[in-house]
């Protein structure tokens, strides 16, 4: 029987660039959920394919639980939104006991309200000519470091922002996954059980994030 796993994948863009994201898989290899950083319209709270106006578009973390049982376990509604496509480059970043893998995944979910509360501008067309680029690939790195898994690169694809994070290093260290006792790992994470979700500043998208994480 296979272990649960956390997989890194790359959605190829225009043949040369890529949007990296995370997939949670069960022991049969089924995709239970996806984690993304996406450009999001500040006024409507909806994600968009690419940010084109830094004044209007912000970087947000999004969680899409696909499996009904998993969604129910975390108090969310199943969401069919998916960036999975056949033939995408993929790397398994972690595999193992179900409770350990879920604990890693949920460490990222717990940090989402803080990530989104920063209301970071999404750079026009995904990159900045001057200054650090903080974009969807930066969210990918941040979420991976929060889960305590290796953050792979994908050769032969441009990934602007992959070397940057959404939070300072010391804050990531404070929030990241740490080894837990078996009893703690087996506790089911729900947003209501985590005070940080309720203390985060409210934004147009915050209700969606709480309902999906």
Placement of each model-derived feature along the sequence:
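Non-Sec secretion/translocation targeting segments of pathogen effectors
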Residues: 199-213
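Extracellular LysM carbohydrate-binding repeats and other cell-envelope/extracellular binding modules
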Residues: 161-162
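A structural signal for well-ordered alpha-helical segments within the folded catalytic domains
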Residues: 134-145
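Sec-exported extracytoplasmic/periplasmic mature domains
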Residues: 117, 144-149
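Non-catalytic ligand/cofactor/substrate-binding and regulatory segments of enzyme domains
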Residues: 1-134, 165-199
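Short conserved catalytic/interaction loops centered on acidic-Pro-aromatic/His motifs
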Residues: 149-158
């Amino acid at each position: 029987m296979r272990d649960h796993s956390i997989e890194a994948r790359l959605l190829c863009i225009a043949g040369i660039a890529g949007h990296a994201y995370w997939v949670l898989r069960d022991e049969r290899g089924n995709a239970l959920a996806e984690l993304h950083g996406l450009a999001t319209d500040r006024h409507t709270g909806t994600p968009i394919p690419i940010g084109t106006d830094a004044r209007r578009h912000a970087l947000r973390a999004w969680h899409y639980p696909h499996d009904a049982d998993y969604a129910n376990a975390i108090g969310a509604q199943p969401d069919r939104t998916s960036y999975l496509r056949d033939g995408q480059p993929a790397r398994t970043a972690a595999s193992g006991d179900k409770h350990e893998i879920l604990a890693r995944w949920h460490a990222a979910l717990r940090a989402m309200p803080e990530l989104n509360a920063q209301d970071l501008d999404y750079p026009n067309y995904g990159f900045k000519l001057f200054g650090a680029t903080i974009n969807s690939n930066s969210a990918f790195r941040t979420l991976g470091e929060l889960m305590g898994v290796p953050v792979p690169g994908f050769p032969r694809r441009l990934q602007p922002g992959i070397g940057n994070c959404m939070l300072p290093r010391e804050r990531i260290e404070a929030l990241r996954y740490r080894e837990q006792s078996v009893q703690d790992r087996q506790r089911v994470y729900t947003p209501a059980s985590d005070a940080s979700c309720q203390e985060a500043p409210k934004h147009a998208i915050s209700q969606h994030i709480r309902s999906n994480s």
